[in-house]
UniProtKB/Swiss-Prot annotation:
InterPro entries per the UniProt record, alphabetical: ER_stress-assoc (IPR010580)
Gene name per UniProt: tam14
Endoplasmic reticulum among keywords: yes
Signal sequence extent: none
Record carries keyword Metal-binding: no
Protein name: Protein tam14
């Protein structure tokens, strides 16, 4: 036998469902990405290390060439 809700219970239930829906909408990933765009710091750090290592390789080649042709 189904339970009959009182009007105050029905209102509370409706309000609860509205709050749940609102919370789900505000916690969505799209909204989070819109508020907090991904940073470029990891990419910048990676580029720095790539440039640093390629500079070291170029210096090593130059040093080898200088010792080879001297």
């Amino acid at each position: 036998m189904p339970t009959v809700q009182t009007p105050s219970q029905r209102r509370a239930n409706t309000q609860f469902q509205k709050n749940i829906t609102r919370r789900v909408k505000t916690n969505s990933k799209e909204r989070y990405v819109a508020k907090h765009p991904p940073t470029k710091i990891p990419r910048n750090i990676a580029m720095f290390f790539i440039l640093l290592m390629s500079g070291g390789i170029i210096l090593g080649i130059l040093r080898f060439l200088l010792t080879f042709f001297s």
